[in-house]
Amino acid sequence: NVFTIIGKQLGDAMARKKDTDVHSLYGSLNGGTTLGAATKFMKASNVQGAITYAKANKFGSQIYILHHPNSVAYLSKEAATVASSGTHELSSGWSADLLKDFWSGLKPMNGVSIFEDGNLAVDSSDDATGVIADKTAMAVLKSVDTRTERQRDASLRATEVVITSDYGVFELDDTRGAGLIFDAAALATNN
């Protein structure tokens, strides 16, 4: 059914839109404080430094990191943090059924789960701004859930499929997070 295919594509597009709306908040958290640096890799020592900063500055008790898969892959390649099959899971307090597709599979470092998201924008220098934050730093508020409707347009001799949603993303507590900049260049596949 063509409407099922279109509905799936529209749903995926709306999810990406909401995702990137949240990403746009990262650079302004904590008064624009950013950790990490452009052209620097997501090494275990850099991640540990960011975690220490977050804990020392009282970001909260449910801290997480979200970054681009290319950055997280460098960490995975560089460090012995890869979880063996099923022995390590998300830190407690996370909804595994909702976040399993974004969890990096890395052991939590100092109790901090690391997630990856390919929707993070990579700039012309191959850097991306992710986030280290507490769960209470940002929020999404929905007044109208996502709806899909069909609308017949006789002049086009077609049926349009329209998707709508009314929501907002905002900083709930600015002091509980910071942008996290690391290199996000793709790892070589031909070594």
Question: Language-model segments: which ranges?
Answer:
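Long, contiguous amphipathic alpha-helices that act as assembly "spine/axial" helices in icosahedral shell
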Residues: 1-31, 57-59, 65-66, 150-169
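Flexible, active-site-adjacent loop/turn segments at secondary-structure boundaries
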Residues: 20, 24, 33, 73, ...
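Generic hydrophobic, helix-prone segments enriched in Leu/Val/Ile
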Residues: 26, 47-55, 112-114, 120, ...
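Extended, solvent-exposed, turn-rich assembly/linker loops in the middle of proteins
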Residues: 27-106
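Sequence/fold signature of self-assembling virion shell proteins
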Residues: 78-191
